[in-house]
Amino acid sequence: MRRATLSLSLFAMAALISAAQPKPEFVFDLGFEYCFDNREFDAGGETFIESSTIHAARLTPAFGVALPVSDNVTHRILAGIDIFKDMGASPTSEDLQSSVNTGLFREMTLWYGLDASLPNSTLKACAGIFPRRFSVFGSSDTPSADMPGRDIPTLFISDALRFYDSNIEGILITSSRPGSYYEVSLDWLGLFGSRRREQFIVQSYGKGSILPWLSAGWVASLHHYANSFEYSGVVDDVTVSPFLSFSLDRLFPCLDRTALTFHYIQGIHQDRRNSTGLEPAFGGQATLEIRKRNIGVKNEIYYGMGQMPYYDVPGPDGLPYGSALYRGNPFYRISKGLDWKAPGMYDRLEFYYQPVVAGFLNLRLAACLHFTRNGFEGWQQKLCLVVNLDNFRIRNRS
């Protein structure tokens, strides 16, 4: 009898412990992006950007396990693959071996994720190799006026880099509450090696509401561009941009969105190999966005010093630092072959059509015109389609 009672007690305890343990659930994360971006800059002599066409598609499936330890906290581990194809980049040889598609698989993605709902805020974190679209520095423009990151100048990350360098290798932490959003990330861009520089970039963004029509925030980045096995020479590139954003919707009720944002942009640059010391660069930017239903206009005007002073400076390997050092829009150089400290103007004017199709689908057709103090530099015709199915759970129906 005692043995039976003891066995029943142990069985009951085991059942209670098993019931208390979180049950893992299979999850998947799927992203698809199609981009057509025709760039014509002959009008300005291709001073800042060469004419070219980006026409490519990407699929990023990932599968894993979610472990909800409570109603407020969930841990996730996922692994996937980045599948990418530049349209028209097929092999020309008739040899079967050269026609296989293994080259479409660019790199593995694998990451740990945390979702935590706190009493007054939501905390999310990722560590590993994960899609850049989880960050405001990698997410595409959406029709939502409340979407954080709409006010990030292209100085911090160019459209092309946002598309081609689609993964973060490091860590991302975000925090949000009603009316505010904050994030910081570390992206390890290069491991010290032969012909490969050690480099990393830290980026941060924050925005919070002060009044119903006024918000304040910041955008910041620190890029450390260091040595390779063959060459020595370190460059530090720091950019900080506090901003104020005004919602003018009440003044223009006939429009769906009217927003005016003012950025102060402070750059601090240093080329240690050339002993430049800390070189500051000052500037300001005003951004006006107007939207009515599916049609909008966004105009960004920057005036100030060049924010990419070493773009054309030869590095220790004899090649200009260029886009390897500066990950933003090259028009923020302001001048080429001139003193970067002389202030100048850059104007980016975009007309777009962006219908609301579905919450997980973003379609955007745009024409983007670029102007400097020399006049019209060129324009882009863009069509982008983005599909994001994030952290969907595969539930067991049995």
Language-model region placement:
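Positively charged n-region of N-terminal signal peptides that target proteins for export
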Residues: 1-4
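Extracytoplasmic loops and strand-loop junctions of Gram-negative outer membrane beta-barrel proteins
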Residues: 43-47, 93-96, 153-157, 187, ...
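Short, solvent-exposed beta-strand-terminating loops
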Residues: 38-39, 127-136, 302-316
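Exposed, low-structure sequence patches enriched in small/polar residues
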Residues: 33, 56, 177, 181-182, ...
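Surface-exposed coil loops of outer-membrane beta-barrel proteins
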Residues: 121-207, 222-224
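Hydrophobic h-region of N-terminal signal peptides that target proteins for export
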Residues: 10-19
